[in-house]
Amino acid sequence: MQSGTCESFQSLSHQRNDEEAVVDRGGTRSILKTHFEKEDLEGHRTLFIGVHVPLGGRKSHRRHRHRGHKHRKRDRERDSGLEDGRESPSFDTPSQRVQFILGTEDDDEEHIPHDLFTELDEICWREGEDAEWRETARWLKFEEDVEDGGERWSKPYVATLSLHSLFELRSCILNGTVLLDMHANTLEEIADMVLDQQVSSGQLNEDVRHRVHEALMKQHHHQNQKKLTNRIPIVRSFADIGKKQSEPNSMDKNAGQVVSPQSAPACVENKNDVSRENSTVDFSKGLGGQQKGHTSPCGMKQRHEKGPPHQQDREVDLHFMKKIPPGAEASNILVGELEFLDRTVVAFVRLSPAVLLQGLAEVPIPTRFLFILLGPLGKGQQYHEIGRSIATLMTDEVFHDVAYKAKDRNDLVSGIDEFLDQVTVLPPGEWDPSIRIEPPKNVPSQEKRKIPAVPNGTAAHGEAEPHGGHSGPELQRTGRLFGGLILDIKRKAPYFWSDFTDALSLQCLASFLFLYCACMSPVITFGGLLGEATEGRISAIESLFGASMTGIAYSLFGGQPLTILGSTGPVLVFEKILFKFCKEYGLSYLSLRASIGLWTATLCIILVATDASSLVCYITRFTEEAFASLICIIFIYEALEKLFELSEAYPINMHNDLELLTQYSCNCVEPHNPSNNTLKEWRESNISASDIIWENLTVSECTSLHGEYVGRACGHEHPYVPDVLFWSVILFFSTVTLSATLKQFKTSRYFPTKVRSIVSDFAVFLTILCMVLIDYAIGIPSPKLQVPSVFKPTRDDRGWFVTPLGPNPWWTVIAAIIPALLCTILIFMDQQITAVIINRKEHKLKKGCGYHLDLLMVAVMLGVCSIMGLPWFVAATVLSITHVNSLKLESECSAPGEQPKFLGIREQRVTGLMIFILMGSSVFMTSILKFIPMPVLYGVFLYMGASSLKGIQFFDRIKLFWMPAKHQPDFIYLRHVPLRKVHLFTVIQMSCLGLLWIIKVSRAAIVFPMMVLALVFVRKLMDFLFTKRELSWLDDLMPESKKKKLEDAEKEEEQSMLAMEDEGTVQLPLEGHYRDDPSVINISDEMSKTALWRNLLITADNSKDKESSFPSKSSPS
């Protein structure tokens, strides 16, 4: 027993390859030859080109039946020449075999792969106690082990396997018992069938059959089980669910698997072709002639009563259950040492259908696979490693699919060989296998392993060059008047109701509260600046009213309700220029503005009618990122600028002398040389300077009367204010830091997942709430948010409606079309660039977009605001990006150690609608809003600007300038584009961004939209500096007029390649060239040449000779 590493596998040789378990649905098949019939190969081409073909079609059935006969014929041919499966044709690699297996079409749903939960149980013997199976490890995606103390699970980690254990596992599958598509209802039936097969094949002596059966039926102890198993009523209900689902005609709610009825279970045929389904003969003579084959209701009851009582009420780990995907099935690995065995017992079982076996798995889901490995004492660690190997294989994406679709043991062996062909070996002298490897953040796709190679040496589904991100049907010209708008309405109308029902989530509440605070301040600030520029004709109350009305209409009827409307800098510049022009020429500002607004709305509607939004496809990532980066930088810059401006309103004494604090004072005195404006204001107010007691005035009174400040505690224009500026700085940076920290709280190690998720969703709102409470508690008079308290126009000489002509000459209505053209470009570019950024494919939006409908709503509301004398509002880039980021959906069901998958965005209309409804109601909430410090809102602006920069490729490329090549991240474009070309692309983009910034902050800001439009032409000129392939990786490809013709040509070429195949047989591309390419090897053949594998085979051959001299005691069935 101790003579060799492989001695425990002596009995494996008794099961020959020709003694396969018979699949219940018919023939087996082999893919060891590469000369496939053309009809066969056609059934797999659909997989190669990635087209999903529904299962169960008539053609599929006919082709599958035909293929089954040919597979059986090939089986016989293969078995005659390759009996033990040790050698295969040199031109047939495991990858080819696996790709053929995965291309098989099945007539039922039993072989459709499901997610798998794998559990490793080992049998434990203790003195004075009954043996039991103890859970030692589990896999959903990564391995988790029960720690040595037995009290807790380890952190998930990437399983590292020894090559020796993988070879031993291959030997187990190759020589052990393989039972595929077994029909069974209970674990006892499974054990009966496995042991019957073992005995009939001479792999197990009949005199120990009963003891092995008893060992398999021992109770299972799982890590989550405690001594008191009936403390929680809900646990008992789960056990009851499991109990009911194992009864006849019941359905598993988790996996949707029907449990087999009480009909006599079908089993595999033995070598005498005696069907288990039609016979109740004694397969269990080793158990004293007891009847095991026939299952009567009475027998079922007796077995149930014999089962361990704790399985009825065992606990279920509800937290772990949430991580298991719906429809998942279980794979149970049972390994251990039995003192009465002198040979190893190995079995691989696939159940059909999956059955819920009470107490076997840690969680109540149906079991699909079982792997049993029992052997003599002294090899426990070896068995454990083999169990880990098969469990890890079951979590491998490719072998997992092979296990579901395998028709015989050779398919399973091919799956193992393909896995060995893909593994990475760590040198033993440079790595400690006991070190647990942390799960990676991003797991590479395994699709390439499932796809065959094509003649040019690339994969059929290899990495395709990325194409433009905005070439969908939404941007195709219809050639009809308002054709694009009609299609937008048809596209969005079916989702209108779901846009409201999908908002029933705490995430939407968090997004709404956060963005309400974020939107309020810029709207009020914009209104205040507009009031200063227009002498109060349009101010804060008009800005609030206009934003609320426009936002509500857009959120209800817009094509992309995730877009948030707001005020923009170029609009403010335009308003200043227009007001100055009207004042110089004596024109009515509001009337001329109404005329310009109506012309702008009309021009935008004409753009909608002519499908002009289709031009958006020329706005590539180059333009998007330059525009978005500029807006983000403006947010950051203005947040810091507002903070610095507080130093003027709240100055500090930079030359303090602590010894002279008792002499510090600041008094208000009469100005020595009052200005003419001051004297005029005094006369109009009937104020005499000599009558004023200047020393008794407050700071606000002294400032309003234009008094002067005198004293050591006085600044240039104001008294020094203690603490306010420094406190504002603390509030500002505390807001930024706390917002970022709480947003990342979802990935922290503290508190349960639900708590972390809620804190992350409400991060900014909680930050604002905390800062308001702290500011209120400290009591320092920091500047607060000022909201108008009365709903009426700022000036009494204007109403809520403005006539376009008014007192202006009639020709001004016609002349207004000239500035309206500029405004139209401004509105169109701002709106559509933001919409393009929101609608990018990376956001995985499912309800479609509506560029034409968006522009129509903005145009209509712009006309309404013009008539009512309200500010114009258009898509706000940073607010919209922040809105999208706050509504990101991640998979709730992720395996331990696996990063949650990004699923998309919660697309709905409610958050935007509620933001603007509450904004309009803010006039009635001034008593609450007056407690919000302005530095906190400035901090929120900085956080929004900085967080919106994440994911912008432009800034990732800027970082590359200061990184050595060996430390650069593995960006996909760095693999395909030379670094100097990447830097050149970045420099050009930085130059354009710098030019935009200069124009934005200068008096030429009115032409800012024209410069954004010019970026499109700059991008077009870059075609002369970069190849098309380089631009496809660095940027989106520009659309071309011949694109459709090129696509048609590619399709014709693909069809011609398929037509070149002969009518007879089709040969795989590697045939005839395999030996010419030394880089291509057959892992199965190369493995058979290794000393390790030969040692295993020699041991197996010796075992055959030994067993031939000691025939099995079992009688033939």
Curated annotation (Swiss-Prot):
Residues 1-14, 247-263 have a biased composition (Polar residues). N-glycosylated. The modification Phosphothreonine is found at T93. Residues 1-508, 559-561, 617-625, 741-761, 830-854, 933-934, 1019-1117 are cytoplasmic. Keywords: Antiport, Cell membrane, Cell projection, Glycoprotein, Ion transport, Membrane, Phosphoprotein, Sodium, Sodium transport, Symport, Synapse, Transmembrane, Transmembrane helix, Transport. It is a multi-pass membrane protein. It is found in: Basolateral cell membrane; Apical cell membrane; Cell projection, Dendrite; Cell projection, Axon. Glycans are attached at N673, N676, N686, N696. InterPro entries: Band3_cytoplasmic_dom, HCO3_transpt-like_TM_dom, HCO3_transpt_euk, Na/HCO3_transpt, PTrfase/Anion_transptr. GO terms for biological process: bicarbonate transport; regulation of intracellular pH; regulation of short-term neuronal synaptic plasticity; transmembrane transport; visual perception. The keyword Lipid metabolism does not apply. The chain crosses the membrane at residues 509-529, 538-558, 562-582, 596-616, 626-646, 720-740, 762-782, 809-829, 855-875, 912-932, 935-955, 998-1018. The modification Phosphoserine is found at S88, S275, S1056, S1084. Pfam families: Band_3_cyto, HCO3_cotransp. Residues 1-26, 57-94, 244-312, 456-475 are annotated as: Disordered. GO terms for cellular component: apical plasma membrane; axon terminus; basolateral plasma membrane; dendrite; GABA-ergic synapse; neuronal cell body; perikaryon; plasma membrane. Signal peptide: none annotated. Residues 58-75 have a biased composition (Basic residues). Residues 530-537, 583-595, 647-719, 783-808, 876-911, 956-997 are extracellular. Its main location: membrane. GO terms for molecular function: monoatomic anion transmembrane transporter activity; sodium:bicarbonate symporter activity; solute:inorganic anion antiporter activity. Residues 15-26, 76-89 have a biased composition (Basic and acidic residues). Belongs to the anion exchanger (TC 2.A.31) family. The N-terminal cytoplasmic domain is likely to have a high level of intrinsic disorder. Sodium/bicarbonate cotransporter which plays an important role in regulating intracellular pH. Has been shown to act as a sodium/bicarbonate cotransporter in exchange for intracellular chloride. Has also been shown to act as a sodium/biocarbonate cotransporter which does not couple net influx of bicarbonate to net efflux of chloride, with the observed chloride efflux being due to chloride self-exchange. Controls neuronal pH and may contribute to the secretion of cerebrospinal fluid. This is Sodium-driven chloride bicarbonate exchanger. The lineage of its organism: Eukaryota, Metazoa, Chordata, Craniata, Vertebrata.
